[in-house]
Amino acid sequence: MPDLSWFDSYHPFQDHLDYLDDLTDAFNNSETFVSGTSLEGRDQKGIHFWGKHGKGKNKAILWHGTTHAREWISAMTVEYLAYQLIAGYGKDKLVTSFLDSYDFYLIPFVNPDGFVYTQTNDRLWRKNRQTPPANSTCYGVDLNRNWPHEWDTNPQGSSNDSCSQTYRGVSPASEPEMAGMAGFADKLAKSQGLKLFIDWHSYGQLLLTPYGFSCDTFPESNAEHLGLMAATAAGIASVHGTNYTVGPGCETLYPTNGASYDYAYDVSGAEWASLIELRDEGEFGFVLPPEQILPNCEEIWAGTKVMLSLV
């Protein structure tokens, strides 16, 4: 089993792929999978693990990170959650109950091309690496404005300008990364049922619930979603005193149409869906220092255990 020294620093993309293999080598009830392929041909590689009932027998939990390339802490967080779930199975009663109740599908990198670009060219690159449309020199689509749901319903929630950081692309799911993710979420929903969906981002310390596309529309389960996230926030704060704000995405952060958690909830039919903005609140922003990786992961693990106990 790999040890926690992995979380002392950030790593190149290939090392992350190797780390997923190391985790599956250490745990029999696991496998790697590919949800889709990026524009430049890189796999969206994930890890799937399960408990005593066997593969694919329980409802699915789907978590993913690095939709936005510069948000390096999100991949480390997803990998830490995978590590703790695998390390605790058969040893920790609560963790064992989680894996015996659900199949977990964790994808650290939705946007591998963008992530590689942040390591080679521009640390603060956000979008994927889509080539510029006609009459433009600006690369990239914001993948969290490209999900095929409420794609262009709110002009404040995305942009049709390819030079904008929130450029939504030429059409819903025009980007292979999003077509792959949407198809994978739907596949899980149809084959197993989708219990919980989380899209991990940074920064801001926010636990966001549907919806992003409208500040006036709320899901029927709005109160339940807010209650779950409030309990999660308390779990997070119990470790290092880090405070997270809870609320519907649009009114708490800003409008986002074509967003992941709205799609997961409305289209895939996830029972619970959230977009979580990790540390910090702006001191370091997207460039969270390596010494904060482990404290961030520790507190998120505590909150996640609360969440999984309540869904």
Predicted regions: what is each one?
Residues 1-311:
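M14 metallocarboxypeptidase catalytic domain recognition
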